From Swiss-Prot:
Key words, A-Z: DNA damage, DNA repair, Hydrolase
Biological processes, Gene Ontology terms: base-excision repair
Organism: Shouchella clausii (strain KSM-K16)
Pfam families: Pur_DNA_glyco
GO molecular function: alkylbase DNA N-glycosylase activity; DNA binding
Membership in a protein family: Belongs to the DNA glycosylase MPG family.
Name of the protein: Putative 3-methyladenine DNA glycosylase
Keyword Cell cycle (UniProt): no
HAMAP family hit by this protein: 3MGH
EC number in record: 3.2.2.-
């Protein structure tokens, strides 16, 4: 497979909603121990900062964990939930703490290594159809926190966005976010089976 072309920093400086939609069909690439792992992104969620009750920076909260959200766009925001590492990319301008959560991928390249990391065959619908599943398959850990995701070894690259049928739905698992839980800020490729089990 030819060398992947990383997305420019300007891509992540767009509105967070546009980034979340625009990443559907793009590639997530991890050059790990001599193997290039590539997954096609099929599901994302947008988190819109200080006014979004579901966002870690709601009300301008700032902790050691969330500090990276206030930095430049394109940075990696990883955190753990129920022992799983979740991958987010920081968006907008510095000081505007918004991010996109990567929720699911389809394996494209480096599949054998991804299967080894995940402990499951890539043909399984459950292989990477969730944020904790995809980080395990891609070898992404908390050590990647703060990394700039526009250059190797971990980055986003141009894929085939035009083949995606983008569907917007409510986000998953944020019932405590009040009215914000109803915003259609989750985006999936309606043509893909590799998305979270929840559908509207």
């Amino acid at each position: 497979m030819e060398q992947q072309k990383a997305l420019d920093l300007s891509f992540f400086e767009q509105s967070t909603i546009e980034v979340a939609k625009g990443l559907i069909g793009m590639h997530l690439v991890h050059e790990l121990d001599g193997v290039t792992l590539i997954g096609r992104i099929t599901e994302t969620e947008a988190y819109l900062g200080v006014l979004d009750r579901a966002c870690h920076s709601y009300g301008r909260r700032r902790t050691k964990r969330t500090a990276i959200l206030y930095e430049e766009a394109g940075r990696c925001y990883t955190y753990t939930m129920h022992t799983h590492c979740l991958l987010n990319v920081v968006c907008e301008q510095k000081g505007q703490p918004e991010a996109v959560l990567i929720r699911a991928i389809e394996p494209i390249s480096g599949v054998k290594e991804m299967e080894r990391l995940r402990g499951k065959p890539h043909t399984s619908r459950e292989f990477a159809n969730g944020p904790g599943k995809l980080t395990k398959a891609m070898g992404i850990t908390m050590a990647d926190y703060g990394r700039l995701l526009t250059e190797p070894p971990l980055y986003f690259a141009k894929g085939d966005h035009t083949n995606a049928s983008i569907v917007a739905t409510k986000r998953i698992g944020i019932k405590g976010a009040g009215p914000c839980s109803h915003h259609p800020w989750r985006f999936i490729d309606g043509n893909s089976r590799a998305v979270s089990a929840y559908r509207p």
